[in-house]
Amino acid sequence: MRLCGPLSNAALLFFLVLFGVPAIQAQQNAAVPTFQSTTTLVFLDITVVDKKGHIVTSGLTKDDFSITEDKRPQRIFSFEAPESHAPNKHASDDTPDGNAPTTIFVLDQLNSSLEDFSFLCDQMQKYLEDQPSHLAAPAELMLLGNRTLELLQGYTRSRTDLLFALKHVPTETPYKNIPAFKDERFFQSIQALQQIALQNEAISGRKNIIWIGRGGPGTILAYRNIYSVDKLERFVHQTTNMLVDARISLFLIFPGLKVQEINALPGSKTADTTIGLDPFGGDINFGGFVNESGGRIFYNENDVDNLIRQSQRLGAEYYTLTYHPNESGSAADADGKFRHIRVTLRNPDLQVITRGGYYAPDESHPIDTEKQTILNVSQAVQSSIPYTGLAMKVDSIVRHPESRSADVNLVVQSKNIHWESTEGGKSTANLILLAVSFSSTHQILASKLQGIAFSATTQDQAALAGLSLKASVTLRVPYNTRSIRIAAQTEDGGGIGATDLNRQAIDSLSTKAAPAAKISPSL
C-alpha cells in the first residue's frame, strides 16, 4: 500500500488499520519455535518502606509477603531480594543487562511554562553534576517537546554524555501550554508513555521513568459522547498494560503544585483504592499511570535534584515477586475490568509501593494482533527515539528515478525473532514492516506497509538466533524527501526495530537501477 502526498499521523494510522497488511511476500531464511502459554505470570516489583519512609532491603523473605488479586489470595511463584538487582558498578557496557533497573529521564517541555522548564533543567543539571562520572546503571535522557518525544541521549553510564545532552536541549517556546491545546497535550503525553514502553519492552528487568514536569492534563468524560468515552478508556487501559508488560514504573516530579491542589491532582488516589474502583473512573488523568505502574508523585517541593535522587532510589531497591492468577484463562477473566492487586506484609509497620493492578482482556473488544502490530510499528516509525528490540540496518538502496521510488534492502538480525516450527524440520517467522518518507517538517510524503515471511531449514534455536536475514521494501521517495524511517515488528508482537536514513545517507547508499530494456516491435 502506498500513501501519496503529505499525511498527518492520524491519517496514516487510519489507513494502515483500515486496510491492514498486504499478503505476506515470501523471503528467505530464519526461525525459532514459538511456545504458547495458557497461563499468565504477573511480575510485581515491590519497594518496602517503614513508618519513617526508610527503604527496607533486608530481613524479609517470601513468607513475609501476601498477595491478593480482587480479594483472591494468590500463591507466590518466585521471590527475589533487593541484592539480586544490585548494579555492577564496574560494568563498562552501556547496554542494560536486565539485572539493575535502568532510568529514563523525561524533560516535560510540552506541559511546562518557559520559566518552569528552565528551572527544571537547572535542577536536572545539579543532580547530574552530583553523580559519579561512571553511573552504576545505564540511563537515557528524553525531551517531550511541542511536536515529538525526542531521545537526546541513549542509554549510557557516562555522566558527561548526559550533561552534554542536557546543555544542548533545543530552546523552544512551549506554545501548546494553553487551554486551546489541552486535548492535544493529553494525547501527546500519554502517547509518549506508549512510545517509551514500546522502546523498552525487549529490555528485561525493571525500568523507571523519572518524569520531570507536570505531566499531561486530564480530561473530563462528562463532556464527551459515549463512543468517545469508550475509545478513550480503551486507550488508557492499553497504555496501563503496556507499562505493566514492559515493567516500567512512572515517577512524576512537579515542584510547583500547591498543597491545596492535591485533591485535583491526577492520580492522587493511593494504590490501595477500594476494591472494584477503576483508577481511571471518572476523569482520565496522567497521574493515574503513576499509581498503576508502582511509582510516586512528588509535589510542592523545590528541591528537585533531591526528589530525582529519591525517585531513583525508590525504583532501585526493591523485591520482585511473581504469581499466576488463580482464575486466569476462565471465561469470567475476559471482562476487560481492572484487576486490583494488593500486597501486604506480615509486619504491619511496613508498607509497600508497587503497581495497583492491570486490565484484563476484554472479549467484547478482542485484540486483533495484526492491527495491534500495525499500530505499534506506526508509532515507532513516527517517533524519533530508537527501537532496538529487533536489530536491523539498511544495506543498500536502488533508486528508480523514473518513478521516484527506491528499493531499500535491509539486513535483519534474528536474535529476537519468534519462530514457529513447520513440517520437514523447517521454521518460519513473519514480520510487519512499515517504511515512511518524511519532508524537512516531518510531513509524511509516502509510506509502504508490507508483511515479510522468513523461512529456515533448521529448528535449532542457537542456529536460528544467529541468522542474518535479508528483506526489501520498495518505497516512493519524492524529490523533497529529507529522511526515511523504517520500523518492523514480528507479527506475534515481539521486539520492535527501527532504522533511519537522512538525505545524505540516502544519496550515499543509492545506486541507480539500470533502465528497462526496450523491446523492438516484431516485423
Model-derived regions, located:
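Scaffold/interface architecture of coatomer-like assemblies
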Residues: 25-523
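N-terminal secretory signal peptides that target proteins for export/translocation
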Residues: 1-7
